[in-house]
Amino acid sequence: MKCPKCGSLNDKVLETRQSKEGVVIKRRRECLNCGYRFTTYERIEEEHIEVIKKNNTVEPFNKEKIIRGILLASKNRPITQEQIKQIADDIEKYLLDEGKLKVSSAEIGDLVKNRLKELDPVSYLRFVSVFDGFEDIKDFEEFIKSFEKKI
């Protein structure tokens, strides 16, 4: 570790302690060049998911956007806030577990659709109609016909 006083890279660790929560390691170090003592902290760097939008811009993953989208689609439907939050948490966990740190908004939308399809067909239809950009009643009719064939 580089000494903040003299810039030397030679140091020794005098003491190591783990935080009560177990998420941070604190190390007391001493520079072997100038004798200066300093503290460093070590923590796990969280991975951040990036979302590639339809227009190819990239933005940080925002679980709240999933929650808002599902809330709109499930308004006045028998879906609880806890279920909605769980869907968003599950999607984030899935992406991290699979190592998908760059993911398209379309893939996230598909993950939401799959969960809503299982949970509530009306909320699913509402979500799909907005996400897929239905323009008129024909889009709904075609979707419902294809949906009924799959059931």
From Swiss-Prot:
Cofactor (UniProt): Zn(2+)
Function description: Negatively regulates transcription of bacterial ribonucleotide reductase nrd genes and operons by binding to NrdR-boxes.
UniProt-listed HAMAP family: NrdR
InterPro entries (alphabetical): ATP-cone_dom, NrdR-like_N, RNR_NrdR-like
Cofactor binding note from Swiss-Prot or TrEMBL: Binds 1 zinc ion.
Ranges for domain ATP-cone: 49-139
Zinc finger (unnamed): 3-34
Gene Ontology terms describing biological process: negative regulation of DNA-templated transcription
Pfam families noted in UniProt: ATP-cone, Zn_ribbon_NrdR
Any GO molecular function: zinc ion binding
Family stated for the protein in its record: Belongs to the NrdR family.
KW Zinc (keyword) present: yes
Keyword Metal-binding set for record: yes
Protein name as catalogued: Transcriptional repressor NrdR
Alphabetically ordered keywords of this record: ATP-binding, DNA-binding, Metal-binding, Nucleotide-binding, Repressor, Transcription, Transcription regulation, Zinc, Zinc-finger
